[in-house]
Amino acid sequence: MQEEIRLLKGEEREELERFLERAYGHGRGFFPRNYPNLWPQATECSLIIKSQGEIVGHVGTYPLKLVIGPTTILAGAIGGVAADPKARGRGYMSSLMESSLQIMAEKKMPLSVLWGDRQRYNHFGYETCGQKYYLELNRRSLERAGAKPADVREVDPEDPAVLAEVQRLHSTLICRVERNFFQLLLTRPGVRVFMGDGGYLISRGEYSGDLVLQEVVSPTGREPELGLCTEGFIRAGDNLNPCPKASL
């Protein structure tokens, strides 16, 4: 049977899921659980290549709306790049990436973003760009700066009122990614949402003292106070290691 590159069909979702689990070595059900916002878009965004009736390669091309002040830029986010471990070296990944780039050009996406090995993706025109800051915060430095823990409460991320308020606050950011599946993002394993003091905090981790800060938004500039908000952070010790906002 001739190899073909095309978009995933609805009845192939489970086959793709098993394929990605084998390629990445992740547990069963990992991708729908941890990327619930991407999975509904699979038939529109997942390019696959099939050989002998089986999926042997995949590249996801997911549309992103980047908002920078008054400007909106449509970009293509690349994810789930994988080739069958037994079929590597046959050019499947290159063929899929070239097809993805062609689709993005047809959709007039001026920008594409991915996370991965620079040398691997430089061949397709990708290059390291922008600035990334690593901030190491601790309780002592925040307290010395005059930050006091904000008065917040943990809320139910599945509550429609909570979702609406988080979306409203997120929309105040000058630079942001528009999120079409915000409610699904908040259902990922271990996600906790805290609100108060005119802002919100999203963390991952279910044990007290083991929370990983994912995102803090405060239109009034009180991010440090929100960062100190929970007893769990205080008991976690000195280091609070925030993850990049792009992780949500």
List the model feature ranges, each with a label.
Residues 1-63, 70-77, 142-179, 210-212:
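Short amphipathic alpha-helix that is part of the acyltransferase structural core
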Residues 87-99, 109, 221-225:
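Conserved acetyl-CoA pyrophosphate-binding loop and the N-cap/start of the following alpha-helix
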Residues 128-223:
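Amide-forming acyltransferase catalytic core, primarily the GNAT-like/NAT-type
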Residues 53, 83, 91:
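Conserved G/P- and acidic residue-centered "switch" motifs that form tight phosphate/ATP-binding loops
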Residues 44-48, 58, 80, 190-195, ...:
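Short hydrophobic/aromatic beta-strand element in the GNAT-like acyltransferase core
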Residues 227-248:
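C-terminal functional modules
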Residues 106-110, 116-134:
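Conserved active-site alpha-helix within GNAT-family acetyltransferase domains
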Residues 78-88, 213-222:
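A short, internal acetyl-CoA/4′-phosphopantetheine-binding micro-motif in the GNAT/acyltransferase core
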